[in-house]
Amino acid sequence: MLNGLKIQAEKLGYDITFINTCFENRKMSYYEHCRYRNFEGVVIVCANFDDPDVTELMNSEIPVVTIDYVHHNCTAVTSNNIQGMEDLVKYIYSQGHRKIAYIHGQEGSSVTRDRLASFYRTIDELGLEIPDTYVRSADYLETKGSAKQTKELLNLEDPPTCIIYPDDTSLIGGRNVIIEMGLRIPRDISVAGYDGTMISQLLYPKLTTIR
């Protein structure tokens, strides 16, 4: 998606500058930084939309487009998270899995709400009974939380046979734990991600991920 954004922006004569929202010890807010750099517009993707600095930027006079988040003052581009999750769960089911766990992103996010609702609706349609311990929360685009939740899932008395992650970065955190525990993918445990980023296709074995 970011590559597509860059290509289209360059066709229109714009340059793209990336700002890492995980950068600590910032001396300026995002809004101040954008004003200082004279940005003509901002696209916000994979950010913590509860961050006051992000909210300040969205409420400013600078044109802002949000990805997979709806804010009253911004143009929003959203993916079909409901259909995507349904397709992913049904594919996992078709591979023979009946014990499917889901590590979802932050509570309160519209993306999380859509995906979680679709997950529950789809497993109901398939006649599956998923225990509450199989559904857990971890931050988007972060490996530590997904690693912790993966370890807890695999240490359950009746662990899942497949774990869905909220994005490919989180999936890598889970994958690392699986390897550390001496398990093999997909022989001992299957995993699935969300995003279809290039990195997920560079790993071996190739990871199941939805675009």
Name every feature range the model reports, one short phrase each.
Residues N3-D50:
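Central regulatory/effector-binding core of bacterial HTH transcription factors
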Residues N3-Y14, G41, M58-T66, V70-R211:
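Bacterial carbohydrate/catabolite-sensing allosteric modules
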Residues F49-D51, S170-L171:
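Glycine-rich nucleotide phosphate-binding loop and flanking beta-alpha elements
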Residues D50-N59:
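Active-site-adjacent beta->alpha loops and helix N-cap segments on the catalytic face
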